[in-house]
Amino acid sequence: PAEAFDMPFGFSTGGGVIFGTTGGVMEAALRYAVEKVSGEKLKNVDFKMVRGLENIKSAELDVAGNKIRVGVVYGLAAAKKLADRIKSGEEKFDFVEVMACPGGCISGAGQPQTTADRRIKRMAGLYNADKTQQLQKPQDNFLVEQCYAESFGGCPGSHEAHNKLHTGYENRNDMFEVLDNVIAAKDAKVKVVAALSVTDNAGNVPA
């Protein structure tokens, strides 16, 4: 039977809901960052300039006199194009959201196969759910605030939070080559044992 998530995972803001669509991570981050930088309560939590199914989007905001340029991209081919533009100096961003799946998690491999029309409906569903939440901004989730206070160094961006909430990756090809060799050796041994177990009626191993 369906059950509610254990706390603190059962409590979320609209910012957590819209994470499932392209632009959602960016919008949730802006809801936090704009209020943090300006020092003023955010009156309008909707950042519609980062919404939509275009696979590359950009927007510029004025935050307390600072020009902030953000980018949103989904699909790794599109992400490479945008990365190349950034490397060449053609584009410059303060923050870029990248999602691999078309339209974001709403079309991820764990979802039923979909079409562009259904993606639009799924996206609209998340934004509608966002509106029904009592809280829309991530910083209004008191349970997240409690987690940071108790386990992550007191605030987002702290050294302790960075260490605990981020991971790193390194090339493991050498390890997989060793594993392949072990498997190949084991397969060869199995074949030899299988060959030795085949005998004729006199108990001789066929030549």
Please tell me what each predicted stretch does.
Residues 1-207:
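Iron-sulfur (Fe-S) cluster-binding modules
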